[in-house]
Design a protein with these regions (language model features):
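N-terminal module detector in large eukaryotic regulators
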Residues: 1-316
């Protein structure tokens, strides 16, 4: 499949249409699977419910959560999508509210050579459109073949700094334990925190694993209804969605890490590997990359599950 990209939003005319409205704006010319249902599913975005008496406005629209998502697709491909609520449609100040922008990069699994979170805040994914682009009676041009250009926020150094804050390292180890149980328990990780923190929690979990294993763990930084999500790790907001902290904690169907309401599912981390990760993220990140090489060169461990502990025991 190589690399492809596709943009969906409100426009006067999309590349394949003569009508206006919410539609595919454009894609690269070689993207043959652009009409596949799983590609269309990437465009989905549910705006949060507003508090009673609050009307949508340009200012309120700017506060809506962004959904930065990574997903495994069929035919051995993966996608990274940025869904951004724009507010009004292509008509600008005269338009109606309800418009969002969805920009996806789709790539062969083997060609995706960076950690997905590293695309966060990348110039490769658009979060806005120019008025002249979408309010244009002529069909847009094809998009270029995309590049996997890293953003400026997520990298090992920034995650190490993040885990040094307060008791973040301890919370990370609980999240990791939960992530390694997913294959057996099928319980998602639900993270309620400030938007800039959610993606860092996810990146910390991904960096724990060798790249090709991390790429098997899908996520989203915002999910309106985690119960229906295709993601193993879901970021949520504390109000305005189907997520309810007390209900999720009491039902115990998922591992909840709610930093806004200070409510957490209790997870035991009594394991010698956690001491190793504590040291790796505190003093010696190179030791973690050495462990990754050992896994790939000396073990058969290739999926994110609790056999990760056994791989560490062999390494140790």
């Amino acid at each position: 499949m190589a690399k492809h990209q596709i943009i969906y939003t409100s426009c006067m005319r999309g590349i394949d249409s003569v009508n206006d409205g919410q539609q595919i704006f454009s894609y690269d010319e070689t993207f043959k699977d652009r009409k596949a249902d799983e590609v269309k599913s990437l465009f989905t975005y549910q705006v949060p419910s507003l508090p009673a008496g609050t009307l949508m406005s340009e200012e309120v629209a700017k506060t809506m959560p962004v959904a930065f998502s990574y997903r495994l697709l069929k035919k051995g491909s993966v996608s990274v999508t940025l869904n951004t609520y724009l507010g009004r449609d292509y008509m600008g100040s005269a338009g109606r509210f309800g418009n969002h922008l969805s920009h996806s990069i789709i790539c062969d699994f083997s060609d995706f050579d960076i950690y997905p979170c590293e695309l966060y805040a990348s110039t490769a994914l658009r979060n806005s459109m120019e008025y002249e682009e979408v309010n244009n009676p002529d069909p847009p041009a094809y998009l270029q073949i995309p590049e996997l250009t890293k953003g400026y926020i997520i990298n090992p150094e920034s995650i190490i700094e993040f885990l040094e804050i307060s008791n973040n390292l301890e919370m990370y180890k609980q999240m990791l334990t939960a992530m390694l149980r997913f294959q057996i328990e099928k319980k998602r990780i639900i993270i309620c925190d400030e938007p800039e923190n959610i993606v860092k929690w996810i990146a910390a979990l991904h960096y724990t694993l060798p790249l090709d294993i991390a790429k098997k763990v899908n996520f989203t930084t915002y999910e309106y209804d985690p119960e229906l999500s295709p993601s193993q790790i879901c970021g949520v907001i504390s109000e305005g969605s189907k997520y309810n902290c007390q209900n999720y904690i009491s039902l115990n169907r998922h591992y909840v890490f709610d930093f806004i309401n200070n409510q957490f599912t209790s997870v035991s981390t009594d394991n010698i590997m956690m001491d190793f990760l504590d040291t790796a993220f505190s003093f010696s990140y190179d030791s973690l990359t050495d462990f990754h090489l050992f896994i790939l060169n000396s073990t058969t461990y290739r999926d994110c599950n609790d056999k990760y502990y056994s791989a560490y025991y062999l390494y140790n």
